């Protein structure tokens, strides 16, 4: 219903903070529940069983809050984390740009120093919660070097020079609004920088490892719901006086769906454990797990 009516369930999302879901892997010292990536994947998968779009939206908020906690200084953490943990404010992650996708080394949004502010110019694309959320953890270019010139800033929705495009028209996930984020001489305090200048590329890469796991988990949850609905339907629908669940061809299809789902789940859980343990091959496994989970999920849903 939320998807069909394009309803953004902000109250429901905020209520999830009572379960700690506003700060799943934010440290306990910062008010989070400090779970690992495997536990987070289990939570995202379970929520996606009910609504993949809402689960994915909450996962993005968690990525943004985690970046501030993991890499921000004491001042920026004290200023933003309490409201993010309680979800009084909801956060987005702004990396993707027109023409460069999520290639952090190729982004073109610039930030130049002007006194105690950065002045931002550029456009971010496909930003979840764009125009609805309060806080945007944003990757910008402060230097010429491809990867060493990327810096991370916390941008607030109402800062001067920040605007948003119209909501994107999508085939699904319409309970999660998506829009461009536009900077026209936007002024952001230097105090809103997360970590040191030029360190943003490393933060972005670490964030994408967790993001891939969460999107894969959302796909698993949605696919499991579709499989369960399909099994129930085959037991109810009859042909020639027999439930179609008794037909061997139907059983073959359901078995293939279940097998692909369990294979994707096993790889995703393995990748999540590797990210939690900071294994040297964590990025490879998180990318593989996301690819398999989303492709298998689409197949099962179709």
Which residues fall in each region the model found?
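Alpha-helical interface subdomain recognition
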Residues: 1-55, 59, 71-76, 83-88, ...
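Short Ser/Thr-interspersed hydrophobic loop/turn segments at strand-loop and sheet-helix junctions
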Residues: 20, 44-48, 140, 155-160, ...
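Short glycine/proline-enriched turns and hinge-like loops at secondary-structure junctions
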Residues: 35-36, 103-105, 129-133, 147-149, ...
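Short Gly/Pro-enriched turn/cap motifs at secondary-structure boundaries
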Residues: 57, 99-102, 126-129, 142-144, ...
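A short, Trp-centered hydrophobic/proline-enriched beta-strand micro-motif
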Residues: 87-95
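Flexible, small-/acidic-enriched active-site or ligand-binding loops
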Residues: 106-108, 158-189
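A short core secondary-structure module
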Residues: 117, 121-164
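Long, acidic (Asp/Glu-rich), low-complexity accessory segments flanking structured domains
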Residues: 184-202
